[in-house]
Amino acid sequence: MSTDSIGTGREDYLAMLEESGGRNRIAGYARSLGQEVDADAVHRSKSEFFRTALAGSGLTPRPGVVDTIAAAKRDGARVGLVTTTSPGNIASLLDALGPDIRREDFDVVVDAATVSAPKPDAAAYTYALDALGEEPAGCVAIEDNGAGVSAAAAAGVPCVAFPGANTAGHRYDGARSVVDRLDPAELLPRR
């Protein structure tokens, strides 16, 4: 079956985002339709499309993100980017967000090449905590999806859910709050 054989509408796509791990998500969706696909090839095509779409998108940071990173750095906090997407997707995203948000803003970047298990597994957060030399209770995670909130909780990191347009319908059990913008005064632990 070709990589373009699975057609999905927006509602199907949003439902698929409940599960982390693009390849797993694609394979699971195909199985639910009684189809067999080369999930790796479909995922590669999707990622190439994503990167191309980001390149000239004029993407801007979500409300409060730049201020929160700046306040954390100003207060001497270490900042991590903890995801289980591919390094290529992260590079494309940071290129699109630059110069407002740059890779250099983060003391550690965890991605799919760093850990083998996607969220909701705690591995990405455990790795970040070790790399930063931090205890979970002294940190705060900001997550935009249910699997990310579950991963932070599994690692013992308090989490604030910050849903985006594609994840507004997720369940955020375990989040200490759900917000539509980041406010450094409410998020950052006092140092």
Where would I find each of the regions flagged by the language model?
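Residue-level detector of family-conserved "landmark" positions at structurally sensitive sites
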Residues: 9-13, 40, 82, 104, ...
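Generic detector of intrinsically disordered, low-complexity, polar/charged segments
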Residues: 4, 18-19, 77, 130, ...
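A structural preference for short, pocket-lining loop segments at secondary-structure junctions
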Residues: 77-78, 83
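N-terminal helical cap/lid subdomain that shapes the substrate entry/recognition surface
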Residues: 1-63, 70-75
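Asp-based, Mg2+/Mn2+-dependent phosphohydrolase catalytic module
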Residues: 66, 70-71, 86-191
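Intrinsic-disorder/low-complexity peptide segments enriched for small residues
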Residues: 14-15, 79, 180, 185
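Residue-level detector of short coil/turn "hinge" positions at structural boundaries
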Residues: 3, 7-8, 37, 79, ...
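Conserved SAM-binding loop
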Residues: 15, 61, 79, 117, ...
